[in-house]
Every structure is written in C-alpha cells, then in structure tokens.
Design a protein with these regions (language model features):
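Alpha-helical transmembrane segments and their immediate juxtamembrane cytosolic regions
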Residues: 1-233
Length: 233
C-alpha cells in the first residue's frame, strides 16, 4: 500500500498534534509526559515553512503574513500559556518562523556557500537563545535543516536524522526512557515527523482561500478556544 501525503495532509497532521500538545499544557500541566504526543508537530511545521519559502510566488507577502500573525498571536500566547501580558521570556512560535525566514533569505543570498551557511546555522542558535523564541536555540536550526538538506537523497535523509536527533537531545524535555545513565527526552519523538515528511509528494493537495486562511488563523484561534473551554467547563 502506497501512501501519498500532500501539503494539506502534512498541515492537518501537524495541527492535530499541536492541538493535543496545547490541550495537555492547559488542561493538565506543562511538564506532563503526554506532551510527547505532540513532539512531531514542530518539525512538520518547520518543513512546511522551508517548503513554502521555496515555492511561494511572493516572499514579501509571505513574510508580511507571518509578521502580522506573530504580532496578533503574541498577547494570546502570553496570556493563555503564561497568564501575563506581556511575557518577555518566551515568544510565540511564529516569531521563530520569522527569524528562520530571514536566515533562509541570508543563505540564499550567499548561494549556500558551505562555510557561510554553517556560520549562519550556528549563529541562528545564538539568536534563538537571545530572543527567547519558542523552541529557543533549536527552532531556527530545525527549519534550516529542511532548507539546506531539501532534496530526497540518502545523504540528506541521514543529515536530517542526525541533526534532528542532536537538536532534540539539546532541547531536552521530559524523560521518555533511559539508556544506562543517559536520559532520553521526549523531544526525541520529533524524529517521527520524518515519516510523513518523507512520504510527502511535493503536491499541495486540497487548497483554496478558505484553507489558506485556516492555516494562519488556526494558531491563535485554537489557543483561545482551548483556554475558554478550560475556564468554563
């Protein structure tokens, strides 16, 4: 049986996993092991951003849409997850994507020069740490991994597995299991995202203006809905 996954289905998978993650945070607790279910969501969104960067017809408009979404989502993100507006110690994930967008633009301008690209890759970890964006110092590099190692070759697949494993171990999280004295965090489940990503056909799939804006509006909207349900039910 052959599975053909389009961009539409990648979005749906990531949205479902992200929603589960946020339900656990809001209804149970931030440090609950059930959050492991949602770990593959971010790598899928990271891949979709890199793919969108390649395929969009108008990068300026793409960037502006992300910027507006980041600004609109921030007070919602701050209040729902931190009960404080403003909360300066963690910015929502759309800001992570904005900075990754800038990093990809820089890499494109240097024609993917290996040395300069490597410098940008590691510099992005510092930027992520200093700006306190969601996913901290691994967020931007995760997007860049899919941008730099885009083609479906064996070497690129090995690179994706290796880098995502390292980034996941660096970020940590709740202990999923132990290997001797080594604690393996639940972030390692981010690797599962590679299954639907590798099955991606390169096609957009179901798409229209309603779906386009659903992708953008869902992020702040689902936070509001989950929060309201948690307060009144």
């Amino acid at each position: 049986m052959k599975f053909n996954i389009t961009s539409f289905w990648l979005h749906i998978i990531a949205i479902i996993l992200m929603t589960i993650d946020h339900i656990v945070i809001i209804f149970i607790e931030n440090e609950n092991i059930l959050r492991a279910i949602g770990r593959p969501a971010f790598p899928i969104f990271a891949f979709l951003l890199a793919e969108g960067f390649y395929k969009t017809k108008n990068r300026k408009n793409y960037f502006i849409r992300l910027l507006i979404l980041a600004i609109v989502s921030e007070p919602i993100f701050d209040y729902v997850l931190h009960q404080k507006i403003p909360y300066w110690f963690q910015q929502n994930v759309i800001f992570t994507f904005l900075l990754a967008f800038c990093a990809m633009t820089l890499i494109e301008k240097i024609n993917k020069d290996r040395i300069k690209t490597t410098i940008i890759f590691f510099a992005s970890m510092i930027v992520g740490f200093l700006t306190m964006i969601d996913y901290n110092y691994i967020g931007i590099p995760m997007v860049l991994t899919f941008y730099i190692f885009k083609e479906k070759t064996k070497l690129n697949l090995i690179a994706q597995i290796s880098i995502i494993t390292i980034l996941s171990l660096l970020l940590g999280g709740q202990t999923l299991f132990t290997l001797g004295q080594i604690k393996i965090p639940d972030e390692i489940l981010s690797l599962l995202a590679l299954i639907p990503i590798w099955l991606y056909t390169g096609k957009q799939g179901l798409y229209n203006q309603w779906i386009k804006y659903f992708y953008y509006d869902f992020y702040p909207a689902h936070l509001v809905i989950i929060y309201l349900v948690s307060r009144f039910f």
